[in-house]
Amino acid sequence: MEKGTSDSKMRLGKSVGLLEGQVGLRQGQARTPATLRNPVRDPDGGKYEEYGYNAQLSNQIPLDRSIPDYRPKKCKLMTYPDDLPQMTVVFIFVNEALSVILRSIHSLVNHTPAHILKEIILVDDNSDSVDLKLNLDQYVNKNYPGLVKIVRNSRREGLTRARILGWKAATAPVVGFFDAHQYANAAHGYSWALWCMYIIPPQAWLDRGDQTAPIRTPAMIGCSFVVNREYFRDIGLLDPGMEVYGGENIELGMRVWQCGGSMEVLPCARVAHIERTKKPYNNDIDYYAKRNALRAAEVWMDDYKSHVYMAWNIPINNPGVDFGDVSERIALRKKLQCRSFQWYLQNVYPEMRVYNDTITYGEVRNSKASGYCLDQGPDDDNSAILYPCHGMTSQLARYTSAGLLQLGPLGSTTFLPNTKCLVDEGRGRTPSLKKCEGVSRSSQRLWDFTQNGPIISRDTGRCLEVEMSKEASFGLRLVVQRYSGQRWTIRNWIKPPRH
């Protein structure tokens, strides 16, 4: 199917400015990257900015295109039963380049046994593009009658509710959910901000020595997953209260494991994804990722929800984020008799670092310079600085019950460096930031602190203070010296503040 198409397909492809079969740019045909040798000026004035990828190039390479096979070599030797259940594939899109959507369809049809692929459902989350209305309808009706169905939202619903709509339209016993900018071709973890990342597979999988074996994974990337249709219904689908983008994939991972299921990455699956430089849904993706993370934390993470608030550097009480009503999701958890998040950490994601010893966290301000906050400064400098307060994670401080004062983003998993400690080494007048386990005496990293009081080194008795300096940024620098009356505050308290 990759080697040619009918004349009628060729005519229709040309009518919408696209190229099928073996015609078009030769680059990119034989599993190699494609570039435009003589790119023409984009008449629309910035499609790359619009789509977050090179749509001009996409429009000039064939719709039938293979990708490199990066799977373990043993995958090519594997065989599968002929009686696998039929599958519905749901593609979600909004304002996608037409050629990218059609290439996803071609790739899926070309690489999937026909008796397994029952239907393809395209969910248009209220796109603005004319191309994605008449031209898309015309193309799929002509080329894939009965196989490809289009469902359209009358308003922009966001990825989560668009996927739920696709599930409702599906009729096969197995449903696969994919972004529409994919080709058919490590385990997936996440940080305490509930942001997905790749992690090393569990040691048990590594010890097994079989690179083709399924990998137990705590969560998943949201752009490609496959699930039994009825099971997905029984565990509550995706959370329809999630807005726009982010978090739904992490929430599903926690829910599946805590409620008696399992989640796996299949190394022999072959799916490639175009990572867009710009998301089409909203310019404020960080806000919705934060909102959805808090929503998941409130339902599934028990007392560990404080870690999510900490990771985003916002207060637990009155965080300034409306994550909506979670009562129905809490009722679902109770109905399904799901396990605790503590069980999940111990049995599914033991690589997560926990910060239960935190007393207070957030911005640290000094009475002498209240508009400036303690900041980790450049990563390679190992020196804390004062910087105008902005609330980002470089100004996330944590004071622990042991007396550590740590500064910078949480080292959420053992795959990442842990947050550094503020240290008074007793030499000179400047404190340093060091790996907590790397100090010569443990007392050098310990401090006494009370809210609206001094920060005192337990090792030297000197106080962390601020002094004016022409050489320092913003005219202020941190020093350790005899107490001069300066006071400090840390914004957020998990345990009652000590005065």
Positions of the model-derived regions?
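N-proximal low-complexity "stem/linker" segments adjacent to membrane-targeting elements
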Residues: 1-110
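Active-site nucleotide-sugar/metal-binding loop of Leloir-type enzymes
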Residues: 109, 142, 164-174
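Acidic donor-binding segment of Leloir-type glycosyltransferases
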Residues: 109-152
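A recurrent flexible, glycine/aromatic-enriched loop bordering the glycosyltransferase active site
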Residues: 160, 192-226
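Short beta-strand-to-loop acidic/aromatic patch adjacent to the donor-nucleotide binding site
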Residues: 172-182
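A short, conserved alpha-helix in the catalytic core of glycosyltransferases
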Residues: 219, 223-236, 241-269
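Lectin-like carbohydrate-binding module/patch detector with strong preference for beta-trefoil
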Residues: 344, 350-499
